[in-house]
Amino acid sequence: MKQQGVTLIQMLFALGLLALLTQFGATSYSEMSNELHQQAAAKNLAQALRAARNEALLRNQEITLQAKEGDWSYGWQLLSEYSDTPLLREYSAKGKVKIVGNQPVAQRVRFSGLGVPLRSGNAFLSGSLHICGAPGQEDIHMIALSRTGRVSLNRGIPIKPLCPGNVN
């Protein structure tokens, strides 16, 4: 007599293998999705900093890029102090990615009319913003702001991590 189907053991083995492969695929997809969100947030914030500097140079006046609600993770606003409409642009973020800045750039970055970042009291400013990975992961995206106003997007493990709870 010829066999027409599969045995119970063959079916259970195939289902177990399918479940295992699905689990690996879902984990990889989740990690890839998180990495893409972090990369997009880093690029958007670096571009906003460059736009703020360019706007300050173009208008020859102070322009501020300020974190929404005091947290870069929720987005940022481009502001002009000497304009009828102080809000020039608003960038939204959904808070999916945690962004932390060191003390000088924790909540805002102000550019002079010459494109130089300034602290309160008009002292030169430099700092870095870190795009945080998920807890337990390394932070690999960092935006550095130099004293001259140059904005650079770096990829790699920072020397002094700013993100709480992450391993570096």
Question: Over which residues does each language-model region extend?
Answer:
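N-terminal single-pass transmembrane signal-anchor helix
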Residues: M1-Y29
